[in-house]
């Protein structure tokens, strides 16, 4: 059983990332800790004027094979694995001295292989062998040994040594052990994922398959959640080991109640939708569907237009902006409606001051970032569906006019706006829009024509005029009924993928009603 506190008398330091190394080494030497080290780490410590003993001197074997073999030795691993109260006699017989602290980080395999021009040879040379072996030895023996794998751990480690007269607690040794095993698992997963994706080992810079033969995923828990999608379900939020800049997982919560499972799911839908717009935009989401989207001169204009689409559904919604939220807009929102979550890349001080009057409102800050998720995944029974993320945009030059009447410039602008929104609406998705704002949204229906009717109904309930609006459909119309319903509501132009067996009938219907229609050749199903 581990003693509560154990002294640190001997430490082995071997790091690729030398951040904080000298300060750590100096603090250990000040506590009369003997330092062992290897290669470049030993040189850095020695150059700082600190005493250090090379591992080669300890083992009697030089580093060999270009550094591939330097710590794989019983005098090293015995010093890490030796058990207090069990192995002292064996250690004494073979001249093995205990090592109480291991400070080690691994060859930078992840950063090297992240480079587009990384060769297979470079990748292989950055696979650490001795490092993970030592980490596992030290972490296994947490009853007697402490192990640090990250410069971010040094401050706490030194603070505990200071507070406990050069000793480390069992609780900290165990926590550091868990972190070390996690790091080894992450490292091995990165190697496995890279090699599994190599399509041809004969290529110098190998082509990598987007869907390797095996996937090893690592996620870090951000927080426990009050419950899952429903109160009888438990839940937690995890983020990628290396989150993409600008995505939801990089958020900072500035105020408000703890986030729920549904808050995060809705926030992701709102943020991904709003960040695709260049002009100031507001997206209001309810149950992962946009219920109001608009572009304006400023945040306030965009909010007023987005809210007007569906004031009823906006109640208790998630609001996202792609600009710094100003105080006037924050006041207008919080005075008018109940809000679950506010999201923006930043906030004026006055906006945050006013938000404190509604202390339960969750306020999230997500810094701008150009990064996009590369993949989408979905769990099914004992399996995982994986696909490239739907990051496909659309430009005017890609549209095909298929009707007798071509859309006007104003209609084209609205068609592209509606198309962007439809991408984030659950299928079957229909979006009515005019002047860069939504007029009505029909979401999640099993029949496309019913989604079209719901969009018209929503517009009517909000007292918005459909006449002169455009319609976007996330997938093709299998029959002409959706076009007939849209025309009856006052729609003037349509954007859809095309590709139906009855495209001819659908185009004829549009011509009969005098509608302009364009095909994108791209579908945006969302389930």
UniProtKB/Swiss-Prot annotation:
Q: Which reaction does it catalyse?
A: (6R)-10-formyltetrahydrofolate + 5-amino-1-(5-phospho-beta-D-ribosyl)imidazole-4-carboxamide = 5-formamido-1-(5-phospho-D-ribosyl)imidazole-4-carboxamide + (6S)-5,6,7,8-tetrahydrofolate; IMP + H2O = 5-formamido-1-(5-phospho-D-ribosyl)imidazole-4-carboxamide
- Protein EC: 2.1.2.3, 3.5.4.10
Which keywords, in A-to-Z order, does the entry hold?
Hydrolase, Multifunctional enzyme, Purine biosynthesis, Transferase
Q: Which GO terms describe its cellular component?
A: cytosol
Query: What's one GO MF term for it?
Result: phosphoribosylaminoimidazolecarboxamide formyltransferase activity
Q: Is Transferase tagged as a keyword?
A: yes
> Which SMART domains does the protein's record reference?
AICARFT_IMPCHas, MGS
**Transferase among keywords:** yes
What sections of the sequence does the record tag as coiled-coil?
A: none
Every MGS-like domain range: 1-149
Q: Which SUPFAM superfamilies match?
A: Cytidine deaminase-like (SSF53927), Methylglyoxal synthase-like (SSF52335)
Q: Its annotated pathway?
A: Purine metabolism; IMP biosynthesis via de novo pathway; 5-formamido-1-(5-phospho-D-ribosyl)imidazole-4-carboxamide from 5-amino-1-(5-phospho-D-ribosyl)imidazole-4-carboxamide (10-formyl THF route): step 1/1; Purine metabolism; IMP biosynthesis via de novo pathway; IMP from 5-formamido-1-(5-phospho-D-ribosyl)imidazole-4-carboxamide: step 1/1
Classification via NCBIfam families:
PRK00881.1, purH
Fetch the PANTHER family from UniProt. Answer: BIFUNCTIONAL PURINE BIOSYNTHESIS PROTEIN ATIC, BIFUNCTIONAL PURINE BIOSYNTHESIS PROTEIN PURH
- What's the family? Belongs to the PurH family.
Spell out the protein name for this chain: Bifunctional purine biosynthesis protein PurH
State the organism of origin: Xanthomonas campestris pv. campestris (strain ATCC 33913 / DSM 3586 / NCPPB 528 / LMG 568 / P 25)
What phylogenetic lineage does the species belong to? Bacteria, Pseudomonadati, Pseudomonadota, Gammaproteobacteria, Lysobacterales
Gene, per the UniProt record: purH
